Amino acid sequence: MELILLEKVSNLGNLGDRVRVRPGYGRNYLLPYGKAKMATEENIRYFEERRAELEKAAREAEQAAQARLEQLQELTLTIKAKVGEQGKLFGSVGPADIAEAAEQAGVELARREVRMPEGPIRVAGEYDVQVSLYTDVEGTVKVVVEGDAS
C-alpha cells in the first residue's frame, strides 16, 4: 500500500514522503488518524497544493509541544496517595494520574503522552517519568508520590 504522509511519523518518514506500508498499518492506523492519504494522482496533486500550509501547521505543533515540554520539565508534579506499611501504595499511580496532576499545575498533558514502560508506580518516592509530546519532542518529568497514611 502506497501512501503520502501528512505529518512526521516515527520510524516511517517525514511530511510529504511517499511510503510503502503494510495494508493493516495503513488502514488501521495511518489513514483513520489522518497521518496519511492514499497516493493517488488526485491526492498527490492536492497535497502539493497544500504542502506549505501543512508544513507550517506541523512546525507550529512541534513548537507548541516544545514549549509544553519546557514547562513540564520546570515542574515537580506531586501526587498524594494512600500508603500502607513500607511505603507501598494502595493501588498505583499511572499515566492518567500524572496527566491530571499536570493539568492541575496548569500544563496540558494527555494520558497517551505519558510513557511508563516499567508499568505504574506502586511505591511512594521520587520518579523521572518519560513524556512524548510530539514525534521528536520527548523528555522527562519529575514526579513525587507522597504517602498519605490516613
UniProtKB/Swiss-Prot annotation:
One of its GO terms (biological process) is translation. Signal peptide: none annotated. GO terms for molecular function: rRNA binding; structural constituent of ribosome. Keywords: Ribonucleoprotein, Ribosomal protein, RNA-binding, rRNA-binding. The keyword rRNA-binding applies. The keyword Oxidoreductase does not apply. GO terms for cellular component: ribonucleoprotein complex; ribosome. InterPro entries: Ribosomal_bL9, Ribosomal_bL9/RNase_H1_N, Ribosomal_bL9_bac/chp, Ribosomal_bL9_C, Ribosomal_bL9_C_sf, Ribosomal_bL9_N, Ribosomal_bL9_N_sf. Belongs to the bacterial ribosomal protein bL9 family. Binds to the 23S rRNA. This is Large ribosomal subunit protein bL9. It comes from Halorhodospira halophila (strain DSM 244 / SL1) (Ectothiorhodospira halophila (strain DSM 244 / SL1)).
